[in-house]
Amino acid sequence: MEAETTVDSLLKEIDMEMEMQSGNDVAQSNGYLLPLQEIGDETMDMLVQYNTENNANSNVNANANANANQWNKVDDPQDLLPMENNYDDDEEQGDESDTTNLLSGNKHLTEEESEQVLVDSKNLVLPPSSSKSNLINNLKQVVEDEVSDSQLSNDMDDTRTLNFSVKGTEPLLADELQDKEPDMIEVSTIYDGPDMISMADDSDTEDIDLLSKAKKPVSPSKIPITNAQTINYFKDAPVEDAKLQTVPDDIPLETKQTTVSNDILSNVETLLPPTLERPSFVISNLKEASQSVENLGFPDYEEDSQSEQETSVLHHTPTDFHAHEFEVFATELPDINVTPSIKPIDIDNNCEHENRLVSEEESKGVISSVPENENLPAVKSNPSSNSISDMLEIRQENKLDETLNMIDHQLSSNKSIDSVKTVSDNNISKSANDGSVEDVADSGKETSDIARNIEESHNSLINLTSGNNFDQSMHNDLIEESNTRVNVTESDITASEDSFNGSHDQNSSLNNLTKNDNGIQQNLEDNHTGIQPEMVVPEEVTTTLPEVNILPASENMLENTSESEISVQFLQNRDNEDKVSSDPQLEENIRSTETVMNTQETFEPKPAKKNQYTDREIEVLNSQKDISEATDNSAVNSRISSSASNFTPVLPPLPKLEKLSIDDPFDDEFETSNESMQMKNSVKPTDYLSIWHLQEQTTKAVSPALSSNSQFSYNSNSTKSSVASPVPATAFKFKPKIVSRSKYYYPDNNIQQEQSMDFIYTKLPSILDPMRRNTINSKKIRQTVIDKRKSHPSFSVDEGNTITEVNIEPEVKVQPISIENDSSSLKANNQDDNESCSSGSQAFVTPSATMDNFDSQFNELGTSFENDLENVLNYFDKDINTNTSSDLIEETTTKNQALPTSKVWSESVDYSLPTGEEPNVDHNIMKKLLNTENSELNECRSDQEHHIIDNAGLGIWRSTANDIATGNVDMFALNGRDISISKSEMTNDIDMGIFSDKKSLVHTPELSPVKSTHVGSPFKVISPKKNTQKDLKDGTTAEKRVSSESEAAQISIMSAVGEITNKDTAVVDDASNKDNIDAGQVGNEGEPIVDKGLLYLHLQGTTKLSLAGINAHHPKYSIEFDNGKNVVRTDWTELDSRGTISLNKEFEIPIDQSINKLIITLMIKYTRLTNELVEVTKRIPIGKKFPFGKMKYRTETQFVERSTVKDEWDYLFARDGSFGRCEILLDESLFEKIRFKEQDLSFDLLNKWSRLQNNSSSKVTQEALYDLPRRPAYKVGSLKVKGCFLERVSNDEKFPVSLKKAKSIVEKYRSQQDITKEGYLLQEGGDLSSQMKNRFFKLNGVELVGYHEVSMKPKIRINMLKVVKVIGKDDVVTGKDNVRNFTTWVLMNDCFQLVFDDGEVITFSDESSLADEQSWYMKLKEVVELNAFHQPWVKRFSENMIINDI
């Protein structure tokens, strides 16, 4: 607006002047005079600028009063005008001089007259009045030409030439022969710039100044002028303006290698192993390789001279540096390609070096010669394809060693003939496939010994079977099978030697097998000529051959799997990885053909006896009533079990077993429905025998989707084929699903249950069921019985149907129960077949009729019944036949100090004591069995699980909830509830017949029933419930205490899985609870307060005391402070002569229930007066005027010192010097005045010890002085006090020792509340899990709130009172010597952390600036340091102080 107003005012003034002078002006006869208002502002400005440049000497200023804006040379718009040189220098100078003279001579001309003079001087011919606009344009062009010419001339004059001489530089390495001085060098340069002014003569100084002024014209306008030139003027500016020097294009540029590429190469070289030589690299085209490093690659090795072509490829010298080694190096360098960038090197030198390396390697024999027309293999080769044969050879050697060791161990222990034959088959078949001549020879020697041992074992088997009443038909079959196996074994030995000699030159056949699965049979035909694939192998031979169960070699593979099939297994594993399954029929043909090839014998086809082996076997099994079809076993299974575990006995021949694991792509591993399981009758297989029985039972039904010859199907009478068909049954590439199998395979990370399926009686789950007990000795004994029954099934037929029931009549009266060794007390009852356990197992059965009396009579027993019941259960759990010496019992008893026992809730239960038929029952045996440690049991479990998993590759079979147990927690069912009993420890002197009084019973409340389908995790720990009853009597809490150590063990009742509670910890808990109750503490919330708080009294002083004669007695005072418990006195201090006391003493008094009042006493001691000044009046006679006149006297008063008769101070003080006392009642009215605030108080000092003086002038003794009657109490002064009461609300509060420190703490608290800051921070942690976000944070005292960076909604609120410390880069210190960890310091360099009291850490970082981040760190650290002053009393005290200040 100001600019527009200025322009309008100027235009108005010009118009007014033009109107005033229009009548007086006369037109000139020689031309037309143009009015000034028609020229225009733009043209007028150019005219003024022109006149200013050409009239610099006359100091012409177009507008002297205006505030002109000077333009810089860079901003001069004249530089933008075209530069034309249409005039000569002489003519231009003449015109300028003429124009200057005209204008300078007529200083009083108007603007129009000046314009006319300018037109006349230039000889301009103006057009008529009708073309005024053309005149203006012509005039403008003239001015532009003049300005351009003057600027060009000035620029040309500024350029000068500078010549100078420079002395040459002496060489760095001086030559003694050369004594020449360095030559002088002439240098000529063009110099221009403002410094030339200083080089000019003095006479030209004025012209140069005028010239410099002309280059900076003054604008006549008052409006500020802004140049519209671009800011980035260097972008498009010419080279002259930017003063940049460029390099000519003809000079070649040298491409320098980047630092990154150099570092990469150096890193690769440093990562090379010390045994390898550094690789040398040759770049064919240096220029292209340096410009595109990413395109470098590693081609095949070539020994011809083609590396000099323009291929821009990096060649590798043929040294020991291989591709797979380089891949390892590349993986250690992040963000680096496999092809590194390499420094440009000399091509010739590198070629020489490469040739030298090649020659050296060839001389050493490292590099083999390759034909010129062929290329070496690529650098990056596939190790899996090149090393398959090596892997198989190593693996076969290892397996051979393990097999030989196993054979030695089994021969030494005289194992059965089946296990020996199985090992020999594995050994010989392995030797046939081994690639080492020495190993085959060794195996041949071993097999010769094996053959001899086989014969011995065969004879022993004949004796064994004949002595055990085996069926004669089965006996003949076993002998025939043994003979067949011996023949096959001997033939395999020769076959292995021949096959090795025949296939020594064809060791690459196995690699050919890996290329194509369809070429397996063709490969067999190439390696073994003369064998026809259509040959029919007799069934008798086929059944004796080792069966191939193709399992993943890296997971679980049975030890008894024939090693002759290792190549087929490897192929199958590779096919499984590629998700392509081979045909089952084809694999069976391969196995059959390969077995015949190994034997190198020609078998004549014989008509096989249809189902001869199976029928015989089934007839024998059907004759045994105690053995069901679910427990059938085969001779093959017997061999597998004997080789897989050392503790499993020899099994009778049973039907063939299918593979154990399921490699089914359709199988659901995570199915937990257990639809085919009985929840109450689940089995937990503990050994191979139980697993095989389970499989035989669950695989009876054959799925119609399975082929008759599939290796995954069950080979029964209906599905087994007598002849192996070479035609596959189906073209389906995946393995069929076994729909009849009801168990699922689980990984090894679960806990395997050790209860045997043979000893679980599912129909009678009872508390007295001994088969649910699980201890070491009983487990071993039961396993021995199982082995005997399975080895000799003919003797266990009658025993399988026998169930022993022993009932003891319950007695109401408490008395010991002893176990007698009399067999007459035992009653044997035969039960029906439907109540017997499968596989001929035995169980002690408790009749259901006794369960009715169980609840009614159990309460009448003592608490120690739980201990005796545990002994009874352990008695069932142990086998009484165990022959253990007394020395072993004593040794075990001394070692095992902690005895496991189980507790049962106090309910009346009828029970029975089965004792068995064995007459030799010793109490020491029972004691030894009870002393078994839990650790020993766990060790046995872990050893057996490890043995089973290692030998057989089996996992854990999941069971139902009723059979899951964790640790040593045993569970049983009672009244429809699943109960787990935690074992506690008890002393060694327990007698199973001793019961305690029923008065000390600890009752346990009943729990709600748990669903039978509930499956608890074995890793879930549920804390035991302490079953204690508390009786409230007279407002006090009491607890019934346990009388003995055995009764102090707590009872833990849980629904599924519980944790073990030891008696020691339970006793400690009971003792701690008892002490707490006796002390009257009921917990943290109801914990009594230590005191009411702290009372601060600041004694300021007293008013003037009503005490005379202070100066004469020289008194001293002291203050006595009595709170009812302690008495405190101050030092004796001189009393002021004015009678005022300035105390300035502070006392802190903890207020509790015993303190009701405070007594403050002022005590004074003084110096007793011995002499005193007495005023005496004397009469002095005056002379008589008359002789008989009256005698006249004058009086005169005098002070006479005499001994003191009595002192007034003697009647004012008590014996101890007490003079004044005030009593402060500590009541609520006082606390209300001074609670959490400082208040002025005043208390009267009363003298209660003043006595009445007696009127007699006689001197009173000191003893009689205190017997005088006392005066009534009177006020002698006032005590001024400042008081403050800090009330306690928590025992954790800490009060300062003085009121002054309390005030300073409040000040610190206030300063903490005043700390504020806000800004953006990056947060990691807290509510952000594994991520980092930018938020806007506000710090207000102890509250740090984070807001969303856009919406500004609060997202997180951090209580700084919970922060323990703030960690920055300077706070990371470790070690005793406070040595800083440099790594942590680097990581914490750009962030800081808040560490909370629970260990949580939140990291913050500020990206804006380091100063801002340091400010955040310092403020947060100050807040955390001031947290120590953050107590409840501080906040209240601070609030009251603010109110008082207002």
Curated annotation (Swiss-Prot):
GO annotations of cellular component type: cellular bud neck contractile ring
Localization: Bud neck
Compositionally biased region (Basic and acidic residues): 1028-1044
Acidic residues bias (residue ranges): 86-98
Protein keywords: Cell cycle, Cell division
SMART domains: PH
One GO MF term: GTP binding
Major subcellular location class: other
Residue ranges occupied by any PH domain in the UniProt entry: 1314-1425
Segments of skewed composition (Polar residues): 425-434, 495-524
Region: Disordered, residue numbers: 69-103, 358-385, 425-446, 495-525, 823-844, 1025-1044
CDD domains: PH_Bud4 (cd13278)
Domain of life according to the entry: Eukaryota
Any one biological process term the GO annotation gives: axial cellular bud site selection
Family: Belongs to the BUD4 family.
PANTHER family the UniProt entry points to: BUD SITE SELECTION PROTEIN 4
Function of the protein: Required for selection of future bud sites. Cooperates with other bud site selection proteins to recognize a spatial landmark during mitosis and they subsequently become a landmark for downstream polarity establishment factors that coordinate budding and cytokinesis. Involved in the septin organization at the bud neck.
Protein name: Bud site selection protein 4
Organism: Candida glabrata (strain ATCC 2001 / BCRC 20586 / JCM 3761 / NBRC 0622 / NRRL Y-65 / CBS 138)
